[in-house]
């Protein structure tokens, strides 16, 4: 059976709403980023799907109902097709999905992404924000390969990001 985990997709898309709070955190981390370092990092808090088809992501974005606490976000995820992602952090669901036309790719919780760009845009004459991401599978693979201690605690800035996004217990110092 062909493996569902892959590395041959170049660009993936997602249309969804996000909270103003999360959007403002992304802007903050992007503005504080140090060039050359993966500093504006966000993690998936739960399972997360993207699609290989931009039009499908736009359709989902158009279906989103928002209120004063949310904005519409159109994510463009760059996958480096030259990397062997052997951590199995994502799967191509198209061949096993009940809805294969959606061309879904599933990312597992704690998949890491670097925020590359945030900008205002319009889809179907409706305001939204484009959020360009880079998948950090290579970064995670290197962390995993270099890990010497199972209980490694990230540096303070990285730890603060994890805390702020609710991905690290507040009791960890």
Please identify what each model-predicted range represents.
Residues 1-173:
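Mono-ADP-ribosyltransferase
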């Amino acid at each position: 059976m062909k493996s569902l985990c892959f590395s041959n997709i170049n660009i993936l898309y997602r249309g969804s709403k996000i909270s103003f709070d999360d959007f403002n955190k992304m802007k903050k981390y992007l503005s504080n980023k140090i060039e050359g370092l993966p500093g504006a990092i966000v993690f998936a808090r739960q399972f997360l799907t993207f699609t290989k088809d931009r039009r499908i992501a736009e359709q989902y974005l158009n279906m989103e109902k928002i209120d004063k606490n949310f904005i519409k976000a159109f994510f463009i995820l760059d996958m480096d097709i030259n990397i062997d992602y052997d951590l199995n952090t994502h799967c191509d669901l198209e061949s096993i999905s009940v809805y294969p036309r959606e061309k879904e790719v599933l990312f597992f919780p704690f998949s890491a992404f670097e925020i590359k760009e945030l900008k205002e845009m319009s889809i179907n004459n409706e305001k939204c924000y484009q959020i360009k991401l880079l998948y950090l599978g290579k970064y995670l693979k290197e962390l995993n390969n270099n890990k010497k201690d199972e209980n490694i605690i990230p540096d303070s800035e990285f730890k603060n990001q994890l805390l702020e996004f609710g991905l690290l217990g507040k009791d960890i110092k």
